[in-house]
């Protein structure tokens, strides 16, 4: 394997930066927040796959969709109900029988109940990373700084970055896409500058970041106050493009790209090809984003029948799932959809320290019970479910004991993961918890095991080593093992 390359030669970036500024293509940080990376240039993909030591991986799953239930969904109120537990533990909800004999889940997820014979439910996800960052569920690494509100370049790369490192996916599409925005964007009014660690290239470099979509949600009503009457986010994820950069057009960008390519030929006389791969990737991203019809088409929901759009529910997250399906059709290997906190306007997170039951009943569970079955049915009807692995989980579970504000608090000791498609065994329940769903009773599963299982389905050996920033070998699944019996 090759070391991660160092910075470009000292003299080249200032020259190119000056050119970009003069030509009007010097974008500010706010203008490129959704343009973080599009690493799907054909030649570089083939080079990366070659440098990684083999051809592109090929497994049962060709694409993975993560639905990150940001905040920490309650295992006790969703998929691991304990009707015999004391009232201060079991909560207000009743259970219903699912399509999988012997399995009962929350009464407020009737559509999901009807598809459980197609899924594997893992009830014993456990770790010690008490944080709302999706770092652990996207990388398998649970030793990060739980207080971090921005990614660290030394963080391990997520699944999408590893897919890109191995050159997966078509040459004219990004290797990973993050919807509806980077995690933390909706919280920026409370925590300026927040970008929750997780969906990044990390130690592989920012060139392996996903393409971050943009969003500007509206809400179905004005919320009263947080945790009491929060509104549902509406709208669609948007592809960054010319509209995000004032005065930038495709024709103008093509001219600038032509000039930059001429400059690149001069740089090649004094720099190695590895250095050039790190030279202002923005120019390639912007060109591809603005001119490639395939990726723009994937974000164009007007191409979908109204009847199908209604099945997804019309919320921002329903539309994210529909875009995710379109990205799967286009061959994108890794798509992550993140519940987001848009306070004070609205929220779709599971961090319910207050009013847990009303929020779940009236807000979160109806949305989840709409968008997930719609996605599964849509993929299945198109013959894509067997090659698309969906995993649904949050970064932790919730505390068994209900607090004085009718909420549940953080509880990383026990949570769940739901897996569907992509060669995962249908109709399975893995692991058993104790009487209050506080701790695993058998078969504990770490986030690293979840990630290792996903790599296996993608055709990537979970024990593969890739270089960190210092060129030292680093395991992609951080010691995780594929979960036995579900693949």
Where are these regions (language model features)?
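Ligand-binding pockets and gating/stacking loops
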Residues: 2-487
